Amino acid sequence: MTIQSFAIEVQMSVDYLIQQFLDIGITKTKFDFITQSEKEILFRHMNVNKIAVFNKLFLQRKTHSTLNVSSTNGKSKKVKVEVRKKRVYMVPCSIRKSHVSNNTNILLVENDNSKDKYKSDDCNELSELVACDENKISSNENQVMCFISQKEKLDHFTIRQDYVRTNELVKDVNQDLDHQIRDRKGLSNSVCCDVLLNVQDEQHDDNNFSCGLSDDMAVSNNIPEHDKQKLENVRKNLTDRLRSTRTRNLSKLVKQNKHNNSKVCMIYESDKDEKLYVLPSSRVYKNKRKQSILVQSFNKPMQKTVRDVVIGETISVAELSNKMSIKSSSMIKMMMKLGLMVTINQNLDQETAQLVVEEMGHNAILRRENALEELIMHDNNNDYQNISSKLDNAKNDMGYKNRAPIVTIMGHVDHGKTSLLDYIRSTNVASSESGGITQNIGAYCVQLANNDMVTFIDTPGHEAFTDMRARGIQLTDIVVLVVAADDGVMPQTVEAIQYIRDGNLPVIIAINKIDKSVTNVERIKNELNSYGFIPEEWGGHTQFVNVSAVSGEGVNDLLDSILVQSEILELKSMHHGLAKAVVIESSLDRSRGPVVTVLVRSGELKCGDIVLCGTEYGRVRAMRDSLGFDVIKAGPSIPVELLGLSGIPGTGEWLVVVNNEKKAREVALYRKEKKREIKLARKSEKTIIENFNSMDIIKIKELNFIIKSDTQGSMEVICESLKKLSTNKMVMKILSASIGNVTETDAVLALSSHSRILAFNVKVDLSAKNIIELNHINIQYYSVIYSLLDEVKELISSTIAPQVDFKVIGIAKVHNIFQSPRYGTIAGCMVTQGVIKLHKQIKIVRNGIIMYKGVLDSLRHFKNDVSEVKIGVECGIGIKNYSDVCSGDIIEVLDKI
């Protein structure tokens, strides 16, 4: 039988069984065989270990309490205390020895039968005497050995020579008892030797210590009455001598450990389990549990600890001091020596923190906050390169191959961009758009008659959608600039031309609406020629195509021009591997959740892929193409609508496929936290500027808005347009901007902040509708963006108070000053210009400085009250609440324009 099968039979692990064989001196492996004799030796060894364990019983008990500790600031602090008690119950020596004596008696009887010359009664008498003496000796020795064993358990104390003397004392007493036993009974040495061997064997089996018995001892179960008193006296004398010796040793230990500021715990009596705590004051207390809890043993480290401090891109002074386990005040002092004035909550950059850590003698470990993000992108690049190398080595045509061109249609509003795209796609999108204009960016994939694929991106033409047009330019390969034949070059046309120049993109000019009667194509060519677009028939390199979105004239020529241009560009991309895509538009659907429209740039996007997009992540649950059909995968230049993200990403964000969802979630959370920090930093900067503005005399008014939109792009456009409407006297403050219907939370926020709700192509939930109607909250619904902007402009003009301008209608110079009991100070003036009228606004100017603005209170001419005084006439002017008028001052009289 092998060790492995034997372990299964005895229900033990193979490692434990091999260890047991090693303990008895037999080396085995799990494939070795085992004999019957080796089994018996193993079982005997395991039984002995069990007996050794059963001789002791350990009891542990835990008590929980609360301790009130006063702190430096006067407040008490509660500390939870757990007291653990351990009590050991050992089998008394008399019980074990009785077991030994029983076995020994059996051996004596066998000896007596074999040797007739010894009498059984003599052996019994000797065994009784030996048992009595042995019990007494073992009891005393047990006390000493228990004391020594407990001392050996203490880590920072060793057994000293005093205890060795105590052991010698015990041996002397044992020898005296041995001589008494020899004198009482004189038996043959051979019988005593047999008894001694049996006793020692039993003691070895019980894992007990040697009792130091002499060779001529025998064992018995009964103790004679006349020997009890004498042996008891011997035990008492031994106990007294031991106690006196321990007291002397204890005083020596106290003197030696007086300066250690620690406690000495010693176990004296095994049956009582008392603890003596020796404090630095050399006083002995029994069971001082509170002192044992509060007074701790702590040794000050002699060497300075060098720590590894991990430093991010930014770290506060308090956090850095905690990592180095030093006080913040000490760290601030050290930084002041370096010439840095900081506070405890101030953030430090990575270089400064590294300098401080190295100055303190620790090791600085620099960590980039975006390390995980870089790791994911690096893994994606490695996978992409591996796939490319494999395909190149295999010379497979499925690697890099031609992709469909991405064509962006741009132009001024109402020049027919969407209508032209509808004719190409054989759809009617323009008729379903609100206001007849495009307000969202759209991507469509069109399959031509020759099975070639072209992806079109339709951009809005309104001036408010500047950012949306810029995003469309970043994705495109070819630009089709649509210009109406009856309208010519307009502002948004010029803007598109600027984008084309910045991106150095190939362009095709499509002159639309040539089916109208009033057209002037040559004028349009001349206008575009001034911007550097020279037609091919004029010797240039720009293609001009005349088209009509209504009749379809010239549309095929336009498509042919696009295909020719794409062949010249040789557009290729990887069609396998992890996909990369860019977000074109995103929205929130009540039944489907976040819906994201993406354009795949490289790789292959499949259902079930784990994706990371900005601050959001998720798994692709479903995909639809531009026609609304479900698809399983999408290649380069294919726009798809996917579901499964955790939230709504921003337009223009890159979507990448990753291998690990956990890492994707961590990167998304990191990006979200970083975005929040940037937002808070900008908010704090705005708060500082607002505090400075609040110091001005003129109060700046605010209009609070809550914006709800159907798509992410429309929401961004509305926010940017409202911010552009802010003036020095009126600020557009957007409290909340989100996607989806107006909810109860939006209504409550509008009620508490006195805000207006602007709902763009969205509805109101029933719960929010009740709150809005009950509290008369101002909410406006819009479907066209320029209607929204026009109404906001009217609101601003009605809110701002009309500006009042004044003009000077008369000037008077002060010649004399008079005092009147009724009117106070009266200025005697000569009118030098214009007319001075009563109750008009006036300014008092002294040496070119305006001293006072107020109202003309009284006007007299030769003690007669008059309403006006003309040029060249003297008059007296009384000014309300102002008496500091001097001779030579100029008084200007103002009137509203």
From Swiss-Prot:
Disulfide bonds: none annotated. GO terms for molecular function: GTP binding; GTPase activity; translation initiation factor activity. SUPFAM superfamilies: Initiation factor IF2/eIF5b, domain 3 (SSF52156), P-loop containing nucleoside triphosphate hydrolases (SSF52540), Putative DNA-binding domain (SSF46955), Translation proteins (SSF50447). It comes from the Bacteria. GO terms for cellular component: cytosol. Residues 436-440 are annotated as: G2. It is found in: Cytoplasm. Residues 512-515 are annotated as: G4. Pfam families: EF-G_D2, GTP_EFTU, IF-2, IF2_assoc, IF2_N. GTP binds at residues 411-418, 458-462, 512-515. Keywords: Cytoplasm, GTP-binding, Initiation factor, Nucleotide-binding, Protein biosynthesis. The keyword Repeat does not apply. InterPro entries: DNA-bd_dom_put_sf, EF-G-like_DII, IF2_assoc_dom_bac, IF2_II, IF2_N, P-loop_NTPase, Small_GTP-bd, T_Tr_GTP-bd_dom. Signal peptide: none annotated. Residues 548-550 are annotated as: G5. Its main location: cytoplasm. Residues 402-570 form the tr-type G domain. Residues 458-461 are annotated as: G3. Residues 411-418 are annotated as: G1. Belongs to the TRAFAC class translation factor GTPase superfamily. Classic translation factor GTPase family. IF-2 subfamily. One of the essential components for the initiation of protein synthesis. Protects formylmethionyl-tRNA from spontaneous hydrolysis and promotes its binding to the 30S ribosomal subunits. Also involved in the hydrolysis of GTP during the formation of the 70S ribosomal complex. PANTHER family: TR-TYPE G DOMAIN-CONTAINING PROTEIN, TRANSLATION INITIATION FACTOR IF-2-RELATED. This is Translation initiation factor IF-2.
